[in-house]
Design a protein with these regions (language model features):
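Contiguous, well-folded functional domains in the mature portion of proteins
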Residues: 2-4, 8-308
Length: 308
């Protein structure tokens, strides 16, 4: 879900339904695949490639709409959205700590019961940072990732501010969260923080709103370089929306495996983790599914690989 939040989604539901694409996802519990509808290209083509669409886009991403949408989701009036959201996304509220939600944003960042996300005690096992759908890639010089409608090389993902050569031939794990997922995320191993950086999002057209000029969109990102106890140095990247703060990180010098690292508010929903070569053996189902471009559904704290 992008920065347009509920306003964008209600306004452009028809475009998203008409242009939706189906993503194939593997369920590890049932060992079956299912399809999930994703926002399609029709709405985006209208917004980015037509004069009327670009006029609308300027309004949607402007500070006025963003603030108005944020204020609504922070108000008590947004509570009316919760029952419909729970039903539509088939959310089992028995899994979550019972709270007196003050608004929709309060509900969206709800906390899950600890026993619902157990964690292995084996220090050599690598765990999923979040409830999500994961794809694994080998890190090559020409690897490109498409995340929330933007395409990046790994260097672009960290704003060309890091030397990532030491991760060549390693693993790139992309964890995509959908609105029905638990939006808190954790550390996959114990260790210490080496560096943290914030990259603001932006969107602009060159000279004109005319459809012949390209729109350049960059999502807000935060990344941490972590020295872990069992998997050497890793890069941990959170990807949010374009121009609003949807990532909330608990920045700390040291951390333990499975400890909460932060959470996404409405609009932030992707984690990318880079690991060095010969550090991680991923579970076979994730490897095989990724080769076929099938996402594997995983849970917060769930084991997804082991120390090589």
């Amino acid at each position: 879900m992008g920065i347009y939040s509920s306003m964008y989604n209600s306004t452009f539901d028809n475009y998203y339904v008409c242009g939706a694409t189906m993503t194939k996802i593997y369920n590890r519990e049932t060992k079956d695949c299912f399809e999930q509808k994703e926002a399609g290209s029709l709405g985006l083509k209208f917004l980015y490639n037509t004069i009327l669409g670009r006029l609308v886009l300027k309004l949607l991403v402007g500070p006025g709409i963003s603030k108005l949408s944020g204020k609504y989701n922070d108000s008590k009036y947004s509570l009316r959205k919760i029952p419909k959201f729970v039903k539509k996304n088939n959310i089992n509220m028995d899994d979550f700590i019972e709270e007196d939600y003050q608004n929709f944003n309060d509900f969206f960042t709800r906390k899950i019961k600890e026993e619902k996300r157990p964690m292995t005690k084996n220090p050599k096992r690598f765990i999923s940072p979040a409830d999500s759908k994961v794809l694994a890639y080998d890190i090559t010089e020409d690897l490109m990732l498409t995340i929330k409608g933007s395409t990046y090389s790994l260097n672009e993902l960290v704003n060309n501010e890091e030397d990532l050569s030491e991760f060549k031939n390693g693993k790139c794990l992309v964890f995509r969260l959908s609105v029905d997922d638990y939006h808190h995320y954790c550390y996959p191993d114990s260790g210490k923080l080496l560096k943290y950086n914030f990259i603001p999002g932006k969107l602009h057209t060159v000279r004109s709103i005319s459809s012949k000029y390209k729109i350049y969109k960059v999502n807000q990102r935060e990344y941490s370089i972590l020295e872990t106890e069992n998997f050497d140095k890793i890069v941990y990247i959170e990807v949010g929306a374009m121009m609003v703060g949807k990532i909330v990180n608990n920045i700390q010098e040291t951390f333990t495996k499975g400890e909460e690292k932060g959470y996404f508010k409405l609009g932030g929903s992707t984690i990318v983790i880079l690991l060095k070569e010969n550090e991680l053996i991923l579970d076979k189902d994730i490897v095989n599914n990724s080769k076929k471009d099938i996402e594997t559904q995983v849970k917060y704290h769930e084991t997804i690989g082991a120390k090589k």
